Amino acid sequence: MIRLICGLQRPTSGSYRLYGSENTDKKILEAQRRIGAVVETPSIYLDMTAEENMKEQYYVLGLPSFEGIPQTLKLVGLEDAGKKKAKDFSLGMRQRLGIAIALAGKPDLLVLDEPTNGLDPQGIVEMRELILKLNRERQITVLISSHILDELSRLATHYGFIDKGTIVKEITAEELENTCRKCVKLQVTDTAVLAHILDKRGLEYEILSDTQANVYGELVVSDVALELAEQNCRM
C-alpha cells in the first residue's frame, strides 16, 4: 500500500485516491509530489555527510537554493553531524537523515515504514519525539506503517487496518481504546437494579437492553451478584 501511494509500484487491481485524484488520473503525479517518504530503509549515500546527502536530494528535486538544509538538519537533530559520513551513523541517525531527505520538498504528508524498527529504546524515544514535532510544528500529517502497536498508541490519532491489500477498518484512537477496554457483559433480570449498584461503585457501564449491560473496568462479579440477589435481581 505504501509503495503504491508513493508511486514506487503500480496496482495490479483496485484503485486509490490522493488529494482528490484517482491513481489513473494524470494529476496523481502532482499529488505524489506533496508526499515525502522513508520506505523500508532510508535512501542515503553512505560515503556522504548528512549535508551532502541533503544537497543531492535538492539537486534531484531541482530546488534553487540550499538555504533550508541547516534548518532541516537541526529539526531532525543532525546539526552537529559535521563531516561524519553516513556509514558511521547509528541506525537512529540514519533514520533521521532519511526523514530530513524526505522533508526536502516540504511535503504535506510524510510516509514512514516501520520508523522505529531496530532502534534501541533511546532511539525509539527520539524518533517518537521527532514525529510529534513534525506534526505539531510543521502541521505535517504522518502516515506510519508499523506492527509495534504499543508505540503507535503513543502517536496515532487514527488507525487503518489492512488485510490482503484492502483497508478493512478505519477507527480513531479513542474508538480503538474504547474497543480494547476490559469489559464484562452481564445478563440480569433487571438492568435498572444493576445500574443503581454500578453507580454506587463508580463503575462505567453501557445498558444494552432490559436484561444486558457491558461493565468496564475492574469488577468483582461475585460481590455484584450478591448485592443483586439482595434486591431480588438474578444474574
Model-derived segments and their meaning:
Residues 6:
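Helix-to-loop junction immediately C-terminal to a conserved catalytic motif
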Residues 14-24, 30-31:
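Conserved ABC transporter NBD signature motif
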Residues 55, 64-81:
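Conserved ABC ATPase "signature" region
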Residues 106:
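Conserved catalytic motifs of ABC-family nucleotide-binding domains
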Residues 110-114:
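Catalytic Walker B motif of ABC-type/P-loop ATPase nucleotide-binding domains
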Residues 128-214:
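ABC transporter nucleotide-binding domain
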